[in-house]
Amino acid sequence: MVQSCSAYGCKNRYDKDRPISFHKFPLKRPLLCKKWEAAVRRADFKPTKYSSICSDHFTADCFKRECNNKLLKDNAVPTVFALAEIKKKMGKAVKKEQLPAELEPVPAVPEVDPAIGLLLPPLYTPSHIAVICDHNYTVEDTVHQRRRIQQLEEQVDKLRKKLKIANQKCRRQERSLEKLEKEVSEYREAKGSGYVIFPGNYYEVLNENEYKELTPEITYKEIIL
């Protein structure tokens, strides 16, 4: 039976022409064997007397020098597995790089008109135009909304000032009305009732027990009872 490495992802097999040695799992030493099992990183793996790990997964200090790196030390544990993982990751990365990537839009470069020697505006593709239009619409909408909000706030401030002035006028008119009503009431109490006021220098006060006939040319202006 040809020996092969039990480590995950390792495809090394025994070859007399290759300087690779294979080492059996230490089944008679359960604690050390558990470390080997954990190192190979294979789910539900149970080593048998035929299971082995190649020398590629051991560091140099794991071997006995006097045996020409063919025998492991008693406490040796395979720890070199990064190489296989790196190769695996590199293979995936290469596959991803081989996939065709989406073409990125090339920025437009201004051209020079040979006839007049002036820079011409860059030519935009439909995708560039769509992006530019969307961006401009968004900016314009935002600016317009801000201006509109500012206008509404100014209108609200003006209306508040007008309302304040109107309330002040109403309060002044109410005070004026109360003052006039008070003056009228006091005037009535002071003068009493039953007199007539005529225009100019003609007037006559009528009491309850007196009455004088007025001439037709004279008319009264106001009567306060």
UniProtKB/Swiss-Prot annotation:
Q: Which GO terms describe its biological process?
A: regulation of transcription by RNA polymerase II
Note the InterPro entries from the entry.
THAP1/10, THAP_Znf, THAP_Znf_sf
Q: Is Flavoprotein found in the keyword set?
A: no
Cellular component GO terms, alphabetical:
nucleoplasm; nucleus
- Predominantly, its location class is nucleus
Q: Which residues form a coiled coil?
A: 139-194
Q: Tell me the PROSITE patterns matching this sequence.
A: ZF_THAP (PS50950)
Entry annotated with the keyword Cytoplasm: no
Subcellular location per the Swiss-Prot or TrEMBL entry: Nucleus, Nucleoplasm
Kindly state which keywords UniProt assigns to this record, in alphabetical order: Cell cycle, Coiled coil, DNA-binding, Metal-binding, Nucleus, Transcription, Transcription regulation, Zinc, Zinc-finger
An example molecular function term from Gene Ontology annotations? zinc ion binding
The THAP-type zinc-finger regions cover 5-57
Instruction: Read off the Pfam families from this record.
Output: THAP (PF05485)
Record's function text: DNA-binding transcription regulator that regulates endothelial cell proliferation and G1/S cell-cycle progression. Specifically binds the 5'-[AT]NTNN[GT]GGCA[AGT]-3' core DNA sequence and acts by modulating expression of pRB-E2F cell-cycle target genes.
Family, according to the entry, reads as follows: Belongs to the THAP1 family.
Q: Please state what the protein is called.
A: THAP domain-containing protein 1 B
Q: Which organism is it from?
A: Xenopus laevis (African clawed frog)
